[in-house]
Protein backbone atom coordinates (compact mmCIF):
# COMPACT_ATOMS: atom_id res chain seq x y z
CA UNK A 1 0.00 0.00 0.00
CA UNK A 2 2.84 2.34 0.88
CA UNK A 3 4.61 1.50 -2.39
CA UNK A 4 1.47 2.31 -4.40
CA UNK A 5 1.08 5.64 -2.62
CA UNK A 6 4.70 6.57 -3.31
CA UNK A 7 4.33 5.62 -6.97
CA UNK A 8 1.11 7.62 -7.28
CA UNK A 9 2.78 10.65 -5.73
CA UNK A 10 5.72 10.33 -8.10
CA UNK A 11 3.45 10.11 -11.13
CA UNK A 12 1.44 13.07 -9.91
CA UNK A 13 4.56 15.15 -9.40
CA UNK A 14 5.80 14.25 -12.87
CA UNK A 15 2.50 15.32 -14.40
CA UNK A 16 2.59 18.64 -12.57
CA UNK A 17 6.16 19.29 -13.70
CA UNK A 18 5.30 18.43 -17.30
CA UNK A 19 2.34 20.79 -17.23
CA UNK A 20 4.44 23.54 -15.70
CA UNK A 21 7.12 23.07 -18.34
CA UNK A 22 4.59 23.22 -21.15
CA UNK A 23 3.00 26.32 -19.66
CA UNK A 24 6.37 27.99 -19.22
CA UNK A 25 7.14 27.57 -22.91
CA UNK A 26 3.67 28.63 -24.13
CA UNK A 27 3.60 32.05 -25.72
CA UNK A 28 2.01 34.69 -23.53
CA UNK A 29 -0.19 37.48 -24.86
CA UNK A 30 -2.81 40.04 -23.96
CA UNK A 31 -2.99 41.64 -20.53
CA UNK A 32 -0.91 38.82 -19.05
CA UNK A 33 1.80 39.18 -21.70
CA UNK A 34 2.56 42.91 -21.92
CA UNK A 35 -0.33 43.32 -24.38
CA UNK A 36 1.50 41.31 -27.02
CA UNK A 37 -0.56 39.86 -29.88
CA UNK A 38 -0.21 36.28 -31.09
CA UNK A 39 1.54 35.40 -34.36
CA UNK A 40 -0.34 34.00 -37.37
CA UNK A 41 -3.59 35.58 -36.14
CA UNK A 42 -3.80 32.95 -33.39
CA UNK A 43 -6.24 33.72 -30.59
CA UNK A 44 -5.14 35.07 -27.23
CA UNK A 45 -7.21 33.31 -24.57
CA UNK A 46 -8.72 34.97 -21.50
CA UNK A 47 -5.77 33.54 -19.57
CA UNK A 48 -3.16 35.07 -21.87
CA UNK A 49 -2.00 32.13 -24.00
CA UNK A 50 -1.87 31.81 -27.80
CA UNK A 51 -3.72 29.04 -29.60
CA UNK A 52 -6.72 28.03 -31.71
CA UNK A 53 -10.06 26.49 -30.82
CA UNK A 54 -12.85 27.25 -28.41
CA UNK A 55 -10.60 27.51 -25.34
CA UNK A 56 -8.60 30.28 -26.99
CA UNK A 57 -10.98 31.93 -29.50
CA UNK A 58 -14.18 31.66 -27.48
CA UNK A 59 -15.32 33.40 -24.31
CA UNK A 60 -12.82 35.96 -23.05
CA UNK A 61 -10.64 35.91 -26.18
CA UNK A 62 -8.49 39.06 -26.06
CA UNK A 63 -7.25 39.37 -29.63
CA UNK A 64 -6.59 37.48 -32.85
CA UNK A 65 -9.20 35.45 -34.72
CA UNK A 66 -11.69 35.46 -31.84
CA UNK A 67 -15.03 33.82 -32.50
CA UNK A 68 -18.04 36.08 -32.71
CA UNK A 69 -21.76 35.46 -32.58
CA UNK A 70 -22.32 37.80 -35.52
CA UNK A 71 -24.48 36.49 -38.34
CA UNK A 72 -23.46 36.75 -41.97
CA UNK A 73 -24.07 35.48 -45.49
CA UNK A 74 -27.42 34.47 -46.91
CA UNK A 75 -28.79 34.00 -43.40
CA UNK A 76 -28.15 37.69 -42.65
CA UNK A 77 -29.04 39.43 -45.87
CA UNK A 78 -25.57 39.05 -47.36
CA UNK A 79 -23.66 40.69 -44.50
CA UNK A 80 -19.90 40.10 -44.35
CA UNK A 81 -17.78 39.37 -41.28
CA UNK A 82 -15.48 41.89 -39.57
CA UNK A 83 -11.73 41.39 -39.05
CA UNK A 84 -11.44 39.25 -42.18
CA UNK A 85 -13.20 36.31 -40.50
CA UNK A 86 -14.90 33.61 -42.55
CA UNK A 87 -18.65 33.30 -42.89
CA UNK A 88 -19.57 29.66 -42.34
CA UNK A 89 -22.17 27.72 -44.30
CA UNK A 90 -24.48 28.22 -41.31
CA UNK A 91 -24.09 32.00 -41.38
CA UNK A 92 -21.78 32.66 -38.43
CA UNK A 93 -18.47 34.55 -38.34
CA UNK A 94 -15.34 32.80 -37.14
CA UNK A 95 -12.04 31.25 -38.07
CA UNK A 96 -10.88 27.69 -38.66
CA UNK A 97 -12.05 24.70 -40.69
CA UNK A 98 -15.67 24.88 -39.52
CA UNK A 99 -15.92 28.47 -40.76
CA UNK A 100 -13.41 28.69 -43.65
CA UNK A 101 -13.83 25.17 -44.99
CA UNK A 102 -16.68 23.51 -46.90
CA UNK A 103 -19.59 25.84 -47.54
CA UNK A 104 -17.72 29.00 -46.51
CA UNK A 105 -19.70 31.99 -47.84
CA UNK A 106 -17.17 34.79 -47.51
CA UNK A 107 -13.86 35.94 -46.06
CA UNK A 108 -10.56 34.06 -46.48
CA UNK A 109 -12.23 30.77 -47.44
CA UNK A 110 -9.64 28.06 -48.03
CA UNK A 111 -10.64 27.26 -51.57
CA UNK A 112 -11.63 30.82 -52.41
CA UNK A 113 -8.37 32.24 -53.77
CA UNK A 114 -5.41 30.36 -55.23
CA UNK A 115 -1.91 31.78 -55.09
CA UNK A 116 1.81 31.10 -55.24
CA UNK A 117 3.55 28.63 -57.50
CA UNK A 118 0.26 26.79 -58.04
CA UNK A 119 -1.27 29.96 -59.54
CA UNK A 120 1.54 31.46 -61.59
CA UNK A 121 3.05 33.36 -58.67
CA UNK A 122 -0.10 35.30 -57.79
CA UNK A 123 -0.18 37.10 -54.43
CA UNK A 124 -2.99 37.05 -51.88
CA UNK A 125 -5.06 40.19 -51.20
CA UNK A 126 -4.79 42.14 -47.92
CA UNK A 127 -1.43 40.55 -47.06
CA UNK A 128 -3.06 37.16 -46.39
CA UNK A 129 -0.65 34.24 -46.33
CA UNK A 130 -0.24 31.93 -49.31
CA UNK A 131 0.05 28.38 -47.96
CA UNK A 132 2.40 25.72 -49.27
CA UNK A 133 -0.64 24.25 -51.06
CA UNK A 134 -1.40 27.49 -52.88
CA UNK A 135 -4.40 28.89 -51.01
CA UNK A 136 -4.86 32.24 -49.25
CA UNK A 137 -5.73 32.44 -45.57
CA UNK A 138 -4.54 33.12 -42.03
CA UNK A 139 -3.29 30.89 -39.25
CA UNK A 140 -0.40 28.47 -38.87
CA UNK A 141 -1.53 26.23 -41.73
CA UNK A 142 -1.28 29.19 -44.11
CA UNK A 143 1.43 31.38 -42.53
CA UNK A 144 3.63 28.64 -41.09
CA UNK A 145 5.87 26.06 -42.74
CA UNK A 146 6.00 26.39 -46.52
CA UNK A 147 4.27 29.79 -46.61
CA UNK A 148 4.93 31.29 -50.05
CA UNK A 149 4.00 34.91 -49.50
CA UNK A 150 2.07 37.44 -47.43
CA UNK A 151 2.41 37.79 -43.66
CA UNK A 152 4.37 34.55 -43.21
CA UNK A 153 5.34 33.89 -39.60
CA UNK A 154 8.87 34.14 -38.32
CA UNK A 155 10.46 33.29 -35.01
CA UNK A 156 13.70 35.05 -35.88
CA UNK A 157 15.15 37.52 -33.37
CA UNK A 158 15.63 41.11 -34.47
CA UNK A 159 16.93 44.51 -33.45
CA UNK A 160 19.96 45.41 -31.39
CA UNK A 161 20.08 42.03 -29.66
CA UNK A 162 20.31 40.33 -33.06
CA UNK A 163 22.94 42.52 -34.67
CA UNK A 164 20.44 44.95 -36.16
CA UNK A 165 18.44 42.35 -38.09
CA UNK A 166 15.02 43.45 -39.37
CA UNK A 167 11.82 41.41 -39.62
CA UNK A 168 10.40 40.06 -42.88
CA UNK A 169 7.06 41.20 -44.37
CA UNK A 170 7.39 44.60 -42.67
CA UNK A 171 6.65 42.97 -39.29
CA UNK A 172 7.55 45.13 -36.31
CA UNK A 173 10.61 44.41 -34.21
CA UNK A 174 9.52 44.92 -30.61
CA UNK A 175 11.61 46.50 -27.89
CA UNK A 176 12.25 42.95 -26.68
CA UNK A 177 13.74 41.92 -30.03
CA UNK A 178 11.01 39.70 -31.51
CA UNK A 179 8.95 40.04 -34.70
CA UNK A 180 5.19 40.46 -34.72
CA UNK A 181 2.14 42.64 -35.30
CA UNK A 182 0.11 44.74 -32.89
CA UNK A 183 0.66 47.36 -30.19
CA UNK A 184 3.04 45.14 -28.25
CA UNK A 185 5.36 44.98 -31.25
CA UNK A 186 4.67 48.17 -33.22
CA UNK A 187 4.07 50.55 -30.32
CA UNK A 188 6.43 52.06 -27.77
CA UNK A 189 9.99 50.87 -28.19
CA UNK A 190 9.46 49.41 -31.67
CA UNK A 191 12.91 49.14 -33.28
CA UNK A 192 12.08 48.68 -36.96
CA UNK A 193 9.41 47.60 -39.44
CA UNK A 194 5.89 49.02 -39.56
CA UNK A 195 6.11 50.90 -36.27
CA UNK A 196 3.25 53.14 -35.12
CA UNK A 197 0.62 52.04 -37.60
CA UNK A 198 2.80 51.95 -40.71
CA UNK A 199 2.08 48.22 -40.95
CA UNK A 200 -1.60 48.89 -41.57
CA UNK A 201 -0.67 51.23 -44.40
CA UNK A 202 1.56 48.55 -45.89
CA UNK A 203 -1.30 46.05 -45.82
CA UNK A 204 -3.58 48.54 -47.54
CA UNK A 205 -0.95 49.13 -50.22
CA UNK A 206 -0.47 45.40 -50.71
CA UNK A 207 -4.19 44.92 -51.27
CA UNK A 208 -3.69 46.33 -54.77
CA UNK A 209 -1.74 43.19 -55.64
CA UNK A 210 -4.87 41.07 -55.92
CA UNK A 211 -4.65 38.58 -58.78
CA UNK A 212 -7.28 38.93 -61.42
From Swiss-Prot:
PROSITE patterns: CHIT_BIND_I_1, CHIT_BIND_I_2. In roots. Residues 27-68, 69-111, 112-154, 155-197 form the Chitin-binding type-1 domain. It comes from the Eukaryota. Keywords: Chitin-binding, Disulfide bond, Glycoprotein, Lectin, Pyrrolidone carboxylic acid, Repeat, Signal. Gene3D superfamilies: Endochitinase-like. The keyword Cell membrane does not apply. Pfam families: Chitin_bind_1. Substrate binds at residues 36-38, 88-99, 140-141. Glycans are attached at residue 206. Disulfide bonds join 29-44, 38-50, 43-57, 61-66, 72-87, 81-93, 86-100, 104-109, 115-130, 124-136, 129-143, 147-152, 158-173, 167-179, 172-186, 190-195. CDD domains: ChtBD1. Residues 1-26 form the signal peptide. The keyword Nucleus does not apply. InterPro entries: Chitin-bd_1, Chitin-binding_1_CS, Endochitinase-like_sf. The modification Pyrrolidone carboxylic acid is found at residue 27. GO terms for molecular function: carbohydrate binding; chitin binding. Carbohydrate binding. This is Root-specific lectin. The lineage of its organism: Eukaryota, Viridiplantae, Streptophyta, Embryophyta, Tracheophyta.
Amino acid sequence: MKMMSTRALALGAAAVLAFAAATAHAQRCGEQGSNMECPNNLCCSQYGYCGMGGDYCGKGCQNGACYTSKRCGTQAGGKTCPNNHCCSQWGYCGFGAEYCGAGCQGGPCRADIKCGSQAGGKLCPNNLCCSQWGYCGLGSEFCGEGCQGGACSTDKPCGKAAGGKVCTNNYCCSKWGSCGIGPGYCGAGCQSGGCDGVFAEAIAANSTLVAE
